[in-house]
Curated annotation (Swiss-Prot):
Glycan attachment sites: N206
Additional record remark: Izumo is the name of a Japanese shrine to marriage.
Protein encoded by which gene: IZUMO4
Swiss-Prot/TrEMBL keywords: Glycoprotein, Secreted, Signal
Designated name of the protein: Izumo sperm-egg fusion protein 4
Any one cellular-component term (Gene Ontology): nucleus
Family membership noted in the UniProt record: Belongs to the Izumo family.
Signal peptide: 1-15
Length: 219
């Protein structure tokens, strides 16, 4: 049995990308797009760089390759955004670059951003797993930028009493879920998500972020 049951609602929506949900994204990327023609000596770099910036959000969702819902906390989204904007602002502080340099740097920042988002989502997931019983944390859906939450059932209980309380809490949670309006309730992800052997109790003690990332990414 997987170490947790993640009860995230699954919503079909157009992909926007996690960074797109940040409050400064529109302002920042509008500036980046409007000043891209000043960053390269070679005119061919301009349309390539412009396309990279325009497709940034959709390409992010395509590259995440996560086997779990793309839900990120506001705190971690702020951390990712700060890192990305800092790299981008530094790149734009320079004058005109030699041919090929500017779009290559944009690709490097993009790849770094994808990695940061993956780790942010996975770290929160692992933290959630290390509780006993039902635990919830607030998130933003990277699919549609709406407020959401992740509810997990963790097996990290230290006594039979804690375990009994955890199981009762899970039963109450499921019972309350069944009472909700079918058209309004979120579908618990443990009904549709696969189990991940790397997250089972025998493997958790020595689980590193790198191992978890490998486990929770789709191939």
């Amino acid at each position: 049995m997987a170490l947790l049951l993640c009860l995230v609602g699954v919503t079909a929506a157009l992909a926007h990308g996690c960074l797109h949900c940040h409050s400064k994204f529109s302002e920042k990327f509008s500036f980046y797009r409007h000043h891209v023609n000043l960053k390269s000596w070679w005119v061919g770099d301009i349309p390539v760089s412009g396309a990279l910036l325009t497709d940034w959000s959709d390409d992010t969702m395509k590259e995440l390759h996560l086997a779990i819902p793309a839900e990120i906390t506001r705190e971690k989204l702020d951390q990712v955004a700060t890192a990305v904007y800092q790299r981008m602002d530094q790149l734009y502080q320079g004058k005109m670059y030699f041919p090929g340099y500017f779009p290559n740097e944009l690709r490097n920042i993009f790849r770094e951003q994808v990695h940061l988002i993956q780790n942010a989502i996975i770290e929160s997931r692992l933290d959630c797993q290390r509780h006993c019983g039902i635990f919830q944390y607030e998130t933003i859906s990277c699919n549609n930028c709406t407020d959401s939450h992740v509810a997990c059932f963790g097996y990290n209980c230290e006594s039979s009493e804690q375990w009994e309380s955890a199981v009762q809490g899970l039963l109450n949670y499921i019972n309350n879920w069944h009472k909700q309006d079918v058209s309004m309730r979120a579908t618990p992800a443990f009904l549709v998500s696969p189990a991940f052997r790397c997250l089972e109790p025998p493997h958790l003690a020595n689980l590193t972020l790198e191992d978890a990332a490998e486990c929770l990414k789709q191939h």
